Design a protein with these regions (language model features):
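Residue(s) in the substrate-gating loop at a strand-loop-helix junction
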Residues: 138
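Canonical Rossmann dinucleotide-binding motif of NAD(H)/NADP(H)-dependent dehydrogenases/reductases
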Residues: 1-25
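Short C-terminal tail/terminal secondary-structure segment
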Residues: 143, 221, 232-247
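Active-site loop-to-helix junction immediately N-terminal to the catalytic Tyr of the SDR YXXXK motif
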Residues: 93, 144-152, 164
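Alpha-helical segment proximal to the catalytic Tyr-Lys
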Residues: 118, 167-171, 229
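Substrate-binding pocket helix/loop in short-chain dehydrogenase/reductase
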Residues: 89-90, 94-102, 189, 201
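Active-site helix of classical SDR
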Residues: 113, 154, 162
Length: 247
């Protein structure tokens, strides 16, 4: 399950899982974007389908779990990657914007972990089968970045939630990790990536470039598969060295 899989980054993560043999479901609000994502991502021999869902609705998430269990029989990997960004100056952030950003970036992840988690915990307790939850975080969830106040705040909460769940569900074999992208060209970043900001970011990145969506594939497969079976509660940073640099 790849929530937010209609976007560029999570779409590539979904494709990587499908290429590795997973029966993969991408999830998004927009059916047209879902159809376009399937056209873009489908490859011979890969099973990739779309399910509509708004992560701000608990009822829709509950129904999504039921539909996928009915169609696929089981759920083993959950990727939570739905997200919004905003560059509104701090003193100008309205209640409406704040609530929207938190609803998608923070509460959407929490609700998805709850709704899918009920199934995963029940299965683990009855059969001993584990699972992997990958919550997509952000470099701004580690160190606050300028101009993205609400986004940084919500992503920091996702990092904290994930570590809590790793502690809570680890004994059941349910691994919970944060995949932390650095700067990747994505639709939600267009408003904040001015030419001046791009130059600053590149100058602060040892590999001296933005990431490519393909470069999230390896980290996704590691966290999703038995290759990462002893990894839980981790923040796997894929940022070209951005977080390692000070001056």
């Amino acid at each position: 399950m790849v929530v937010g899989g209609t976007g560029v980054l999570c779409g590539r993560m979904a494709q990587a899982l499908a290429e590795a043999g997973a029966r993969t479901v991408i999830v998004g609000r927009d059916r047209a974007k879902g159809s376009a994502a399937l056209e873009r991502l489908r490859m011979d021999g890969c099973e990739l389908t779309f399910e509509p869902c708004d992560v701000t609705s608990r009822d829709q998430l509950h129904d999504l779990v039921a539909r996928v269990l009915a169609s696929h029989g089981r759920i083993d990997v959950l990727v939570n990657g739905a997200g919004l960004n905003s560059a509104t100056p701090f003193l100008e952030i309205s209640d409406e914007e704040l609530e929207r950003m938190v609803a998608v970036n923070q509460l959407g992840v929490m609700r998805a972990c709850q709704e899918f988690g009920r199934y995963l915990v029940e299965r683990a307790e009855s059969s001993g089968e584990g699972a992997s939850i990958i919550n997509v975080g952000s470099s701004s969830g580690l160190t606050p970045l300028s101009r993205v106040f609400t986004y940084s705040m919500a992503k920091a909460a996702v990092h904290n939630l994930t570590r809590n769940l790793a502690r809570e569900w680890g004994p059941l074999g349910i691994r919970c990790n944060v995949l932390v992208p650095g700067f990747f060209p994505a639709e939600q970043n267009r408003e904040i990536l001015t030419p001046e900001r791009v130059a600053t970011i590149i100058g602060h990145t040892p590999l001296a470039r933005f990431g490519d969506a393909d470069e999230l594939a390896g980290a996704t497969l590691l966290l999703a598969s038995d290759a990462g079976r002893f990894i839980t509660g981790a923040e796997l940073v894929v940022d070209g060295g951005f977080s390692a640099m000070t001056i």
